[in-house]
């Protein structure tokens, strides 16, 4: 039996593993008092900067090539500017929302909302308390906006995250209790107060990488599952081949010294406790094919890439991909801190900044995900090679496809071998250059 839990979001300590747990149905979140304080301070910064006469991207001026176009006056919170800001934000949600099915899984949708709420608690977004409450209500009631998985406009997934904003406004469909339901209907059923995106809410909802980060985390959890099974696969293959434990022993791996080498090798050996492979056998080959001998190091490479990817994502979900960014706890101890140009970026206090940036650039995450993908490709590739080796009667001394001679007309495990061979043939180009593991 499992029990739902409430997880605290402070904008500082959320991890990939905790986020994945939160994405399960029934799990709830609560912003810490420190998080709420940062949300309030972050919201105030761009409002104050606009009041001082600064043009704030997405708040007082339009987006992109239209950034010279005014959308609200300096006193943004006062009418008619407040209504103009809400109208602008709502219009942008409707303009940007486009995409094609299939829709993302509910867990990805929920993670995307949790990431955004946690980043609000970090104090980097400039979003309102009303926005934070709206996100929290959907998360805690498992109301998951339908997000098309195809049709992103490019940098920062503008079209994807916009569907979350539309659903918060009650203008799109959500997944609720296993069904596709109009958001307006669910909001009425749950008696939620109307939400109108004001100020920085609009640009901060639609222009961020939270959906991409949620996708990446879902992929990482799959990779984690596959790699957890890999030591069992390697160990069982060694047993089937009457293979050597030599490449996996501590004093062997120690001479290589690469990251995760010992962890991978020990994971394999743990599955060989009590195995006949620990006994002498005159029939055992001196060394095994590379797909067996190198399996530990290739698994180690994938484990290291997984760790690197999780580390980068742990950083990402506690920071932000917004433009502009708000930082209410900025340091002023740099050599350039007293430069005149920085005065134009400060919002009242010396430690409060609203800066134009390109935090939406995800080159590092994209490259890291590619590295993880290639590493998983290596693991899959040699697993397929091991399968082909295990039905080679010259290697094992067993009948072809494990079909007994008297069993006429049977194909035995032929389909498994064919699947492995097709895997080798069709998937190798997907992962880029693979190590030179031939059929040895």
Regions found by a protein language model. Give the residues of each.
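Short, hydrophobic/aliphatic alpha-helical segments
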Residues: 35-55, 134-149, 192-195, 346-354
């Amino acid at each position: 039996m499992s029990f739902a839990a409430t997880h605290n979001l402070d904008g500082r300590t959320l991890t990939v593993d905790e986020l994945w747990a939160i994405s399960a149905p029934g799990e709830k979140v609560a912003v810490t008092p420190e998080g709420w304080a940062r949300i309030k301070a972050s919201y105030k910064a761009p409002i104050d900067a606009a009041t001082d006469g600064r043009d704030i991207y997405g708040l007082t001026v339009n987006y992109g090539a239209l950034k010279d176009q005014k959308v609200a006056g300096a006193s943004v919170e006062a009418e008619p500017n407040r209504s103009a800001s809400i109208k602008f934000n709502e219009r942008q949600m409707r303009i940007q929302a486009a995409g094609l099915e299939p829709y993302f899984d509910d867990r990805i949708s929920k993670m995307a909302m949790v990431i955004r709420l946690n980043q609000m608690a970090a104090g980097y977004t400039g979003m309102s308390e009303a926005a934070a409450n709206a996100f929290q209500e959907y998360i805690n009631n498992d109301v998951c906006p339908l997000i098309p998985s195809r049709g992103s406009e490019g940098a920062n997934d503008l079209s994807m995250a916009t569907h979350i904003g539309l659903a918060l406004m009650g203008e799109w469909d959500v997944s609720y209790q296993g069904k596709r339901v109009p958001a307006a209907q669910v909001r009425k059923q749950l008696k939620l107060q109307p939400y109108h995106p004001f100020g920085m809410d609009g640009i901060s909802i639609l222009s961020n990488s939270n959906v991409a980060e949620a996708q990446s985390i879902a992929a990482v959890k799959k990779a984690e599952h596959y790699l957890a099974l890999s030591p069992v696969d390697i160990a069982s293959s060694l047993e089937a081949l009457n293979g050597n434990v030599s490449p996996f022993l501590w004093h062997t791996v120690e001479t290589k010294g690469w990251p995760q080498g010992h962890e991978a090798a020990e994971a394999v050996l743990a599955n060989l406790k009590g195995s006949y492979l620990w006994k002498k056998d005159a029939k055992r080959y001196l060394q095994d094919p590379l797909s067996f001998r190198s399996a530990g190091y290739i698994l180690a490479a994938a484990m290291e890439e997984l760790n690197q990817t999780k580390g980068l994502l742990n950083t990402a979900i506690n920071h932000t991909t917004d433009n502009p960014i708000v930082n209410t706890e900025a340091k002023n101890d740099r050599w350039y801190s007293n430069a005149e140009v920085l005065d134009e970026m400060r919002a009242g206090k010396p430690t409060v900044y609203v800066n134009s940036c390109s935090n939406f650039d995800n080159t590092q995450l994209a490259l890291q995900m590619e590295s993880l993908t290639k590493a998983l490709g290596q693991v899959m590739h040699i697993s397929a090679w091991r399968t082909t080796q295990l039905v080679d009667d010259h290697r094992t001394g067993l009948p072809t496809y494990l079909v007994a001679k008297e069993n006429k007309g049977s194909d035995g495990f032929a389909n498994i071998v064919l699947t492995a061979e097709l895997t080798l043939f069709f998937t190798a180009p997907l992962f880029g250059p693979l190590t030179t593991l031939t059929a040895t």
